[in-house]
Amino acid sequence: MKKWILAFALVYSSVYAQENKFVSYLKNNKTVLDLNGKTQWEQLKSDAEQNQFLILGESHGAQDAQLIDFSLLKYLNKTIGTQNYIAELDYAQSSCINEYLKNGNETILNNVFRYWVKNNAQWGNYDFYNKIIKIRALNRTLPKTKQITFSGIDKVQDFDLYFKLIDKFLGTKKNLLLDSLRLIVNDSYNDSEIIKISVFAKNYFEKIEKNRIEFEQLFGNQLPIFKYLIQNLSYSSTKKSGVNRPEAMFRNYKELYSILHFENKKLYGMWGYFHSHQIPVQFVGEDFASKLVSSDHPSAKKVISIVCLPIDSKYNVWDSKGATWIKQPFSYDDKTLLQIDGIENLKALTTNNSTTLFKINSLNSPFAKTGQLFNGTAPQGKLMGDFRRRDFAYQYVILMRNSDWLNPLPKTF
């Protein structure tokens, strides 16, 4: 009996010491953020200066993530000159946002958001919309050489908008090589035709390659972006192209990086939770950021990921039966949604209604390769990261407490 008690005591003291090690570290590596005032991001300034691409990760649905995104973007623009927002949008959507940022035409911006509203997507919300308006207001205070622009690297989301952009490239050009493409983009889009479109785009991309000189004469210095649009269109059907969404994002990033000469530019963008992880998830595989950091791309070793974790918050969920948005609990200490290992330590070090930044990659960090603040339990089972090649899934965590939901735009928007 005494041996059993001694063994239990040793195990308990070991677990307590391990937890205390994490808590002690976190106490000395945290900053409380004021999203409505002068937010302090100095804790990550050194990493921002020494790296190229900062990725903010969040599970879509919490309002505070939009506030964090704008606050961090504004800080990076001011301190290290970040202008290029690498967006989880397709290129046509980002082009429309850029047009709005330039001329303030809200009809153009509304067209982007109307697609999400029509498709009951979380992104069709006031908070995202207002963030774009705030970015335009910020740009108007900056010289043109420092203004923020968006670059979309996602698969095609809004085909109608995408076809309009391609049609703008075609313009009034007359050439037999363009006729088949013009027929496709001027036809009304139907989801049932996605395989047909994907195959057509693949074949058309090959046509461009075979007739490069003639296409160069037609498009001049616009040809690289035109080719990018066609190649991304070929990824539309994963079944036919063999290119899933994370792989398409990765390929598109590499293409635009070269076309837009991002080599010496600072890059930033907010992405979905799993897209931002720098390690693959066991039994799920790699996503955008993990593909990038594992590659031989020039920016691969210059990526910093910052992930937002919600506690006692709310998010918007579409109720198909009631055909309306409903406000649901959003807390990553809940196994019915996702319980992140070690998140109770963050909760113990923060207060209600706070937003707190934790740096987990400092020298002698106890988090390296542990899975703490990454591994977790979901209804589908255990979520486990593969840490064989990297120490951290991300370098920073932001705990969002008591965030409201994203306020949905009305169906009549």
Language-model regions, residue ranges each:
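Structural recognition of the beta-strand scaffold that forms the well-ordered cores
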Residues: 54-56, 83-88, 149-152, 266-270, ...
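N- or domain-start disorder-to-order transition segments that initiate the globular core
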Residues: 16-52, 108-109, 137
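An N-terminal structural lobe/cap that precedes and organizes the functional/catalytic core
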Residues: 41-86, 91-98
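A substrate-binding/cap region within the structured catalytic cores of diverse enzymes
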Residues: 100-256, 261, 271-273
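Bacterial Sec-dependent N-terminal signal peptides
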Residues: 1-24
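Solvent-exposed loop/turn segments at secondary-structure junctions
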Residues: 59-63, 90-94, 155-159, 273-277, ...
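Alpha-helical scaffolding within the catalytic cores
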Residues: 31-43, 71, 99, 251-259, ...
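C-terminal regions of proteins
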Residues: 20, 26-27, 276-413
